[in-house]
Amino acid sequence: QPIVDLPPNPFTFEVLALVSKQRSNAKKVELLKKYDHDSIRALFIWNYDDSVISLLPPGEVPYSSLKDEQISSGSLSTKVNQLVGTMEYNDTVSMGNATDMKRGRTTLRREWTKLYNFIKGGNDSLKSLARETMFIQILEGLHPLDAEILCLVKDKKLYDKYKITKENVAEAYPDIRWGGRS
């Protein structure tokens, strides 16, 4: 069956979902090459390179604004997961069908250049509170599914949702050098 073409400048979640659905490694590699972008490479490096050490606390991302507290409680991770669940239930996660309201104000394609702030050796002088605040601000601006990806990557758990291996990534992008980053 033919592979769906994604729109120009697709969201990261659209690329990863499409690649993850492929049964063969060859198809996965082909699509990773087709939708190659520095932002996707950076996320894969953070996720799969053991020498990249996250400076963010592992697990749930704690956050609630005053407005949010009146509506619900819980962490930002919980809120992202609730939005993702609602979108999946309403089938609004299919390629390009997410409503504009839920799309967010920015994308990982735009924000990836800030990721160095969250890893060891990137911006070590940044105070923990400032780093965590910056991370939360980025998450709040992203489409919920891209925010979920960023939360998975910070804990090196991308494979839990997207069945794309380090080997798939290494084959698609042989110029990535693994190790020696921290």
Regions found by a protein language model. Give the residues of each.
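N-terminal nucleic-acid-engaging modules of covalent nucleotidyltransferase systems
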Residues: 1-182
